[in-house]
Regions:
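Extended repeat-based scaffolds of very large eukaryotic assembly and lipid-transport proteins
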Residues: 188-332
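Post-signal peptide N-terminal segment of mature Sec-exported envelope proteins
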Residues: 27-44
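Cysteine-nucleophile protease catalytic domains, especially the papain-like/related folds used
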Residues: 54-108
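C-terminal motif of bacterial Sec signal peptides marking the signal peptidase cleavage site
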Residues: 14-17
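...with weaker cross-activation on analogous glycine-rich loops/strands in unrelated enzymes
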Residues: 97-159
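Bacterial signal peptide processing site
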Residues: 19-22
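Sec-dependent signal peptide recognition
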Residues: 2-8
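Active-site or metal-binding loop neighborhoods of secreted/extracellular toxin and effector enzymes
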Residues: 136-138, 142-190, 321-328
Length: 332
């Protein structure tokens, strides 16, 4: 019930942004309501000196003395989700330019955003979302307009901050390659309610019996293997949060470049029950690429066709669906 409420709240916030485009941020922003698409009334604070130092090192064009922190560090959602008005799921960006555009053009259908998006000029002033990339085959980031002249970005697992439109350029995000505005097609509230109902039905909660079955399978793994895996996992998770190449990344695939991932992958299929056990905690959804890299049976992997409503679920629900599939079909 709690998750359904969160989803509906998310829809309500993004519906306001897409349909009414009203100012819902701080009155201190003196924002133009016609330009503001802030997804929710957000907290604002001044970054600490340590945060300023880190951000300045990794984003040299960022004026850290003129930014605000609008959201604390969390791995629950990323920049792509936030730019679509979603804060309860992580949505990996499509790497290829055209596929990335399709994500936004079909944001309502694919992810449950309250509206789809249309392309607009990257040079104009009417854009509400910018898509970033280092090239047409490496799309990396999404930022959203916050107020007149100010933009907002969720930086991977890290903070959500305000910034001038192009201040994150010449970094791992590359530069702005495409811009969007909310689709002018009116959103029917009845459609939103129906979509919310559909997503609630798709939401997975593993039963106690399923969880125990996973725990039992993991308990059968050799202690030395388990210790090695846990040590590598903890080291990997820590590295993700401090390495600039992963700390700010909106794609869980970026985490696969770290040496700990390679070491865990080399441990082979024996660690799959341990991966499943970790996935019982939905915050560990970023383990999915490791499972996909190790699992050789395609029937035990979750994949989607374009337009599949299950894409709505995000990485967290996909992780739970993967656990359930593995339990139902695995002979291990």
């Amino acid at each position: 019930m709690r998750k359904q409420i969160l989803i509906l709240l998310g829809f309500s916030f993004s519906l306001i942004a897409c349909q009414q485009n009203e100012e819902i941020g701080s009155v201190e922003d003196n924002a133009n309501p016609n330009e503001l698409t802030t997804r929710a009334a957000s907290m604002r604070r001044v970054p600490t000196q340590a945060e300023k130092d880190n951000l300045k090192k990794d984003f040299p064009n960022l004026d850290v003395n003129n930014i605000s922190v609008t959201g604390e560090a969390t791995g629950t959602y990323n920049c792509i989700a936030y730019s679509m008005g979603i804060t309860n799921k992580w949505i990996d960006p499509e790497s290829f330019y055209n596929d990335f555009i399709e994500q936004y053009k079909n944001a309502k259908t694919l992810y449950g955003s309250s509206c789809n998006y249309e392309q607009t000029s990257t040079e104009g002033s009417n854009a509400t979302v910018d898509g970033w990339g280092t090239s047409s085959i490496d799309m990396t980031h999404g930022s959203v307009v916050y107020s007149s002249g100010t933009w907002e970005s969720k930086l991977g697992r890290y903070l959500r901050i305000t910034h001038k439109r192009s201040e994150l350029s010449v970094t791992l995000y590359g530069r702005i390659l495409v811009s969007f505005i909310e689709s002018r097609t009116k959103t029917d509230m009845s459609e939103i309610k129906e979509l919310a109902k559909q997503i609630a039905q798709e939401d997975i909660e593993l039963s106690d019996a399923e969880k125990q079955a996973v725990i039992d399978k993991a308990a059968n793994i050799n202690c030395e293997v388990k210790t090695k895996f846990n040590d590598l996992f903890n080291s990997w998770n820590e590295e993700i949060s401090i390495n600039p190449q992963t700390k700010y990344s909106s794609s869980t695939l970026a985490y696969t470049t770290l040496p700990q991932f390679k070491e865990m992958q080399a441990m082979g299929k024996n660690i799959i029950p341990l991966i499943m056990e970790k996935l019982l905690d939905e915050d560990n959804f970023f383990l999915l690429p490791l499972y996909d890299a190790i699992q050789t049976d395609s029937q035990l992997k979750i994949s989607y066709k374009k337009g599949d409503a299950k894409i709505l679920e995000g990485e967290q629900n996909k992780a739970k669906r993967t656990v359930r599939l593995w339990l139902s079909l695995s002979g291990n």
